[in-house]
C-alpha cells in the first residue's frame, strides 16, 4: 500500500515538473561542459566580470545574513545537494525586489529568487563552505557561490519584458488537490525562466492587488496580463504570494521599495572601488574610483552634486569600520565621467578625487563608500567592523 502511494506521488511530482515549464541547465554532469572560460571566469577585485560569466540558478531564499550580504537558496524540487545553495554577494552584486534596487534584508524569507552566480571571488574561496566532492560531481552548480545579481520573480520577468496572461483557474488533482491559476507567458523566452503555460497554486493567502488595493479572487479574469511573485508549493509546485492585476499597483510596490533603498544607501553611502592611487610625498594623494551599479539613479545624481564627498574604506561585504562618517576622509572631486554600456556590476561612473589623508584601505581594487550631502545617522553597532574578532566572524558564512 505504501509503495503504491509513493509511486502515485512520484508520478504526480513528475507531472508537476513537466507542467511548470522551467528552462534550466541540465543537472547531469555528462551534460555539463568541462571547460567554458566565460562561465568559469574567476572574479578578482578591481575588474568587473565579462558578459555571460557564471550560471543562472533559482530557488527560495531560506537563509540570510544581511550584515555580510550572504544567504542560501532552496530548490523546491529536492534535486540540489547539499539541499541549500549558499552564496555570498560580490561587492558589486545587485539585488532587485518588486522591480527596484534592494538589499538582502528587504527580501522576505521564502521568496522565490533568480540569480546569476560566479565562482568565488579570488581570495574569498573559503567564505562559503565548499560542497563535498561527490556532491559537486552530481551538482556542479554548487561551485558557483558568489552572486552578481539576485532578483524576485516580478523583477526577473519584468526586466526581460515578460508578463503572464491569465487563462483561468482550475482545481488541481493529485494527492493534495489545490486551486490552480492557469497562465501562459507573454513575451520572449527567458533563460532559467518558465517558458510555457504553467499552473501556480492560489489560495486565500495570496495577495491580489488592483488599483493599489487588496481585492478578492473574483477580480481574476481570463485574458488579463499580470505579474506574480512566487514561493514554494507542495509536490514541486510554485505558489503565488502576490498577483498584480494592473501596472499601477505594481508601481506602488516598486516606489515603496525604492524609498527603502534610498534610505539605506543614504545612511550607508554609495559603494565603489579604487582604480588607481597616487600618494603625495607630503601626505594625502589622488585616487580614481568606479561606482558600483544597481543603485537608484537619484543617488548617482546626488553624489555628483557633492563636490567634496567623504570617502570611507570598506570590506568586500560593504561593511565599514566603526563610525564610518567620522573616519571618512573629505575629498575634492577633480573629474567625473559617465561611460555608456558598462559591464554588469558597474555604474559606468568614474571619478577622480584628491584627499588630505590616505587610509590604509585606499588601495587599487579595494572597496570604498562615498557620502553625499546626506544626513549622518549612527548605524546599528552590529554592522560595524571594530575588533579582530569581527573580521574573523565575517570571514566565513556560518551555516545553520
Describe the role of every protein-language-model region.
Residues 5, 20-23:
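Serine residues within intrinsically disordered or low-complexity segments
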Residues 1-2, 26:
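Initiator methionine at the very start of the polypeptide chain
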Residues 22-92, 97-205, 209-400:
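Short, flexible, surface-exposed loop segments at domain boundaries
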Residues 11-21:
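Bacterial N-terminal signal peptides
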Residues 2-13:
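Bacterial N-terminal signal peptides that target proteins for export
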